[in-house]
Amino acid sequence: MTWDGLPTQPLLMLLMLLFAAGSGSALAGCPGCGAGMQTGCRGGCVEEEDAGSPADGCTEAGGCLRREGQPCGVYSPKCAPGLQCQPRENEEAPLRALLIGQGRCQRARGPSEETTKESKPQGGASRSRDTNHRDRQKNPRTSAAPIRPNPVQDSEMGPCRRHLDSVLQQLQTEVFRGGARGLYVPNCDLRGFYRKQQCRSSQGNRRGPCWCVDPMGQPLPVSPDGQGSTQCSARSSG
């Protein structure tokens, strides 16, 4: 399942929503290394103080807080206080990495560090704004009509891209009801159509179910062995 070609802004929004759901889900009440949970803590863990009783899914997840540098993800135990689960630097598919537990617990960065690059105006953009300002002074009539970006119309999007935008709009309410488990995010190609293999997100160590679709998202018949193989035929896009 790949995430190539998807716009950065929707993916960042989805990541924030998924971690908001994770913090309020069953994993939030997981205990630390005590209460017989040590056997599930490979590589060591940090004991969480004042932890409540184990919630559903804690035993399966290991019930630990991950240390700095240890792997983490949306459906794995939380990072220790002061750490955040982040994709690796230059990760090509950050959303997928966090969904399958390939993130890393790292020191939380302050707001000033995250916004430093964004706050620095690019030289080309600054010069462009200066040029536009001078042009408006020379031609006052042109300033009456503000320049607006040309949004992509729904009719110009592929069916998978429209589906993805719809999912992002609904996530804000669904994740806070525990709807992040078994989440299905459409797997789109560069043209906005469905890739041949679609999968639900993994839960813990269990991989989510996958199925095959055509470019319009219609499910294709399962393999002749009846096992629902994820080896999709060449008839579908992707």
UniProtKB/Swiss-Prot annotation:
Q: What biological-process GO terms show up in the record? A: cell migration; positive regulation of MAPK cascade; positive regulation of stress-activated MAPK cascade
**Signal sequence segment:** 1-25
Top-rank taxon of the source lineage equals: Eukaryota
- Residues of the region (Disordered) are 104-159, 218-238
- Provide the record's note on post-translational modification: O-glycosylated.
- Does the entry feature the keyword Zinc-finger, yes or no? no
List all disulphide bridges recorded for this chain: 30-33, 41-45, 58-64, 72-85, 79-105, 160-188, 199-210, 212-232
Q: In what ranges is there compositional bias, type Polar residues?
A: 226-238
Q: Which Pfam families match?
A: Thyroglobulin_1 (PF00086)
Chief localization:
secreted
One GO cellular component term = extracellular space
Q: Which keywords annotate this record?
A: Disulfide bond, Glycoprotein, Growth factor binding, Secreted, Signal
Stretches with biased composition (Basic and acidic residues): 110-120, 127-138
Q: What does this protein do?
A: IGF-binding proteins prolong the half-life of the IGFs and have been shown to either inhibit or stimulate the growth promoting effects of the IGFs on cell culture. They alter the interaction of IGFs with their cell surface receptors. Activates the MAPK signaling pathway and induces cell migration.
| Subunit relationships | Interacts (via C-terminal domain) with PHB2.
* Protein's name in the database: Insulin-like growth factor-binding protein 6
